[in-house]
């Protein structure tokens, strides 16, 4: 079975959306992964009319909407594991808005949750405390994601990027802990360079969650 290829659209940030889709398709890609800040910093500011327009453009240009990524880059200042309760709740509200945007842009979308700067421990928190807040936040938004047909993918990142979820084993552990079909994980060949086990072994062990 041949792989399908999608392109992340942040390289087209200042382009007209239709022209960006035309360009992506012209290079042979069949899918598009959207960074929401290319549309608006705050997803809730995107009207339903614009969401329908974006969805129709992707259909017109024969591109499959894969999902969203770079979910915490904008607006600035967000952080999902901070001990600051007000900021943490604001940040998870942002994720809730993104879930709705993702569902409105196309069916069966995924949200790749990398964003190392906005999830790593901060404010004097330990790695364990930050990880617990991350798990609690994901568990809290999972019912909404499930009801909207969106799958959130917490991504394992190298220790140089974040101290929260540094391996596929750790990502799989929290996915199983949450126990929602709307929270799975992913295998990223770039971010897997620091894994200590062969990649094929990791994929075999966690294939049901990837």
What are these regions (language model features)?
Residues 3-9, 32-34, 65-70, 111-113, ...:
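Hydrophobic faces of well-ordered beta-strands that scaffold small-molecule active sites
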Residues 9-17, 37-50, 119-122, 159-165, ...:
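Acidic-and-aromatic substrate-binding clefts and catalytic sites of carbohydrate-active enzymes
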Residues 18-19, 57-61, 77-185, 194:
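Active-site acidic/histidine proton-transfer and metal-coordination neighborhood
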Residues 18-37, 105-106:
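Catalytic domains of carbohydrate-active enzymes, especially glycoside hydrolases
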Residues 21, 196-210:
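A short alpha/beta connector and helix-capping loop motif
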Residues 28-30, 178-184, 205-210:
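Glycine-enriched alpha-helix->loop->beta-strand junction motifs that scaffold or abut catalytic
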Residues 29, 63, 107-108, 210:
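A structural motif
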Residues 45-62, 67:
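Aromatic-lined substrate-binding rim segments of carbohydrate-active enzymes
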């Amino acid at each position: 079975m041949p792989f399908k290829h999608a392109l992340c659209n942040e390289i087209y940030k200042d382009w007209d959306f239709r022209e960006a889709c035309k360009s992506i398709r012209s290079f042979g890609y069949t899918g598009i992964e959207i960074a929401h800040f290319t549309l608006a910093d705050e997803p809730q500011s995107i009207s339903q009319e614009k969401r329908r327009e974006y969805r129709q453009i992707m259909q017109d240009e024969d591109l499959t909407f894969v999902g969203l990524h770079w979910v915490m880059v904008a607006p600035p200042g967000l952080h999902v594991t901070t001990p600051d309760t007000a900021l943490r709740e604001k940040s998870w509200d942002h994720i809730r808005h993104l879930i709705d945007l993702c569902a409105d842009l196309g069916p069966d979308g995924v949200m790749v949750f990398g964003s190392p700067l906005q999830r790593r421990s901060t404010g004097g928190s330990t790695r364990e405390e930050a990880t617990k807040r991350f798990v609690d936040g994901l568990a809290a938004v999972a019912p909404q994601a499930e009801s909207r047909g969106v799958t959130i993918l917490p991504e394992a990142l190298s220790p140089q990027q974040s101290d929260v979820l540094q391996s596929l084993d750790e990502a799989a552990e929290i996915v199983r802990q949450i126990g929602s079909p709307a929270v799975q994980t992913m295998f990223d060949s770039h971010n897997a360079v620091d894994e200590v086990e062969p990649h094929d072994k990791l994929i075999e062990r966690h294939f049901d969650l990837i």
